[in-house]
Amino acid sequence: MKKNIHPQYNVISASCSCGNVIHVRSTLKHNINLDVCDACHPFYTGTQRIIDTRGRVNLFNKRFNKNNKNPFI
C-alpha cells in the first residue's frame, strides 16, 4: 500500500450565526462560518418562520388564492 496518500484531518471550528460552535474533523485548514445549525434550524427546533423575500409569499398567495375570482390575474 502507498504511504502518505490520504489528506491530513484537522480539527476545525464551525461557528454558527446563532453563536453555537461545533468542533469537527475536516481536511480544511481553516475555520468555517455557518448560517444555520441544529441549534437554530427551524426543522430541529420545531419552530417555523416564513422569510418573505421581496413580497414573493404575498404575491404567491394573491395569485393562487382559492377565493380569488380570476386565478389568472
Curated annotation (Swiss-Prot):
Its cofactor is Zn(2+). Part of the 50S ribosomal subunit. This is Large ribosomal subunit protein bL31. Binds the 23S rRNA. Binds 1 zinc ion per subunit. Zn(2+) binds at C16, C18, C37, C40. Belongs to the bacterial ribosomal protein bL31 family. Type A subfamily. The gene is rpmE. Keywords: Metal-binding, Ribonucleoprotein, Ribosomal protein, RNA-binding, rRNA-binding, Zinc. InterPro entries: Ribosomal_bL28/bL31-like_sf (IPR034704), Ribosomal_bL31 (IPR002150), Ribosomal_bL31_A (IPR027491), Ribosomal_bL31_sf (IPR042105).
